[in-house]
Amino acid sequence: YVTGNSKYAINKANVTANGDGGDDFSGWGSAVMADQNTDVTINDSYINTAGTIRTAIWVGDSSKTTVNNSVIYAQETNDDYSTYSELVPSMMKRVPFALGMEGTIRATNVLGAGQAIYNNSMIISTGWGALSTDSGTSYNNTGTYALQVNNSVSGIGTVEVAQAAKKYTATQTVNGVTYGYTMGGSGYVTYADSGVWNKYSNVRFYSPDYVQILASGESSSIYDDSYMYSDRIAFMTQQAGGGTLTLKDSDIDTKDALMQIKSGKANKGYSHLVVDNTDVDFSGDSKRTDDGILVELVESDDA
């Protein structure tokens, strides 16, 4: 836990945190938590958490956490009913069911005016979200990206040290070790709410559900020179929250739709989609009748 107006470095660490967390809106139970106005750098490390809402990287207030050449892996555990029921955080302990996903752990959660920066890393959650924001502060007020991800692999599923004869969804060499990622479970790769802006450069994102959800008319996400894969819908705006999505010099494989815009009385935002020199491929077998749709307007199930 790093707090105050401090600067801290974590180098070549192997961090394991097992057991349920306490509250991923407050950072309780996180493997690395930074708040107030701290500057944390994590280099050449492996951080592994296992448990309900056992966040790996939590960034809040006006703090910044930079992760270089590291693996961040957050795993769900199968709590029995009584154990799960006794866990009572201030907000959520699983992804909202109305989003049509399952999962109980976010690998990264950025709140307030916090910043999480990833370089040449692998960020994986078995279910819910890998790179999440929640209750953020608008870019109009901060002038900084909540999430900035470069040269990294992120997704929903599992990760292990790569075995020579085994096929993986993606691999990434981190700190001299090649890791294999296998897509599975349920959830989204990344999220933008409350007017935050995110930027992704030369990333590879994989999800069985959504690559990204935007939940604010002022939110923005920019992808360049990247590859994104979704088994369902690549991008979704929640409750007609709107926002601006820019896809530049990238490739996307999806099955149902490129972008799904949900109606909703709670937010009256406008969605902006910019596709610039980007290939969109609707290959694969869709699980529904209607597929191959660039922009889909639907009634919200999360009004």
What are these regions (language model features)?
Residues 7-36, 61, 72-111, 127-191, ...:
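Acidic/polar low-complexity surface segments
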Residues 6, 38-46, 67-71, 120:
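Parallel beta-helix/beta-solenoid
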Residues 37-38, 51, 114, 226, ...:
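Periodic glycine anchor positions in long extracellular repeat architectures
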Residues 49-55, 126-128, 208, 218-221, ...:
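Internal alpha-helical scaffold/solenoid segments in large eukaryotic proteins
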Residues 13-18, 45-47, 52-53:
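N-terminal extracellular ligand-recognition/capping segment immediately after the signal peptide
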